[in-house]
Amino acid sequence: MKLLIFDVDGTLVQSVERADSKCFAATYETIYGKPFPTIDWHQFPHVTDTTILQTVIQDHFGRALSESEKHAFEQKYMELLRYNRRKQPHHFSEVAGARAMIHRVLSMPDTLVAIATGGWRKTAHIKMQHVGIPSQAFWVSGADGKTTREAIIEESLEIAHRIEQRFSKIVYIGDAPWDVKTTRNMQLDFVGIRRRGDREVLAELGATHVLQDYLDQEVFLEALQAAEPPK
């Protein structure tokens, strides 16, 4: 049995001109009346919704983020995600071939599929369902109650091991430099996706298999089989 763990943003779904990142910033500015500092996620200690919000709250107000505050932010953020998708649905799409590829791996009897995203679980469902990815068909691990990407993937692994004790191969599929860093730290096999074709971004960081999209399903499946941890 193989385990495939997918990231969401930039890996399965994409938005025009980083619309979802801008949506996160707009939610913050609406609630707190202060400018959101940056949507360059490299500037944050961990690229998860929880850590990003905690960091900005600490910087602006010198205090920790409460659970009720996080919940209120998430609700407003989800409202804006849904509104934007109703208003401009074509601005939010799958990475080319992602939906068909997910359906294919879900149909493979020797493969278990999971999601581990730096976003919150409910927001990930909104993004995937908008493009027709059946997010109810697999477990989604997100930043709910977790601050690091390692912790998110660990949750996904823990749940998978309840279903199957041993896997012949475990592969994480992601698009960002922090995905390379995380899988190297955890010594997980990795396949990179760079939808703009700039594969060197991840290759230069040590990723050995980087594709542009999922349009050639056989090439993607071959990459999964050959995947190894980033060097």
Write out the residue ranges for each language-model feature:
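Short amphipathic alpha-helix with an adjacent loop that forms part of the alpha/beta core around
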Residues: 217-229
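Conserved Lys-Pro-Asp/Glu-containing loop-to-beta segment of HAD-superfamily phosphomonoesterases
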Residues: 152-180, 184
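Acidic, Mg2+-coordinating phosphoryl-transfer loop and its flanking beta/alpha structural elements
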Residues: 172-212
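A short, structured active-site edge motif that brings together acidic residues
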Residues: 40, 69-74, 134-148
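Substrate-recognition element of Asp-dependent hydrolases with the DxDx(T/V) motif
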Residues: 98-129, 139-147
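Short acidic-hydrophobic, aromatic-tinged amphipathic segments that line or gate anion-handling sites
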Residues: 141, 209-216
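N-terminal helical cap/lid subdomain that shapes the substrate entry/recognition surface
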Residues: 2-8, 12-100
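Extended hydrophobic secondary-structure segments that form protein cores and membrane-embedded regions
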Residues: 6, 42-44, 140-142, 169-175
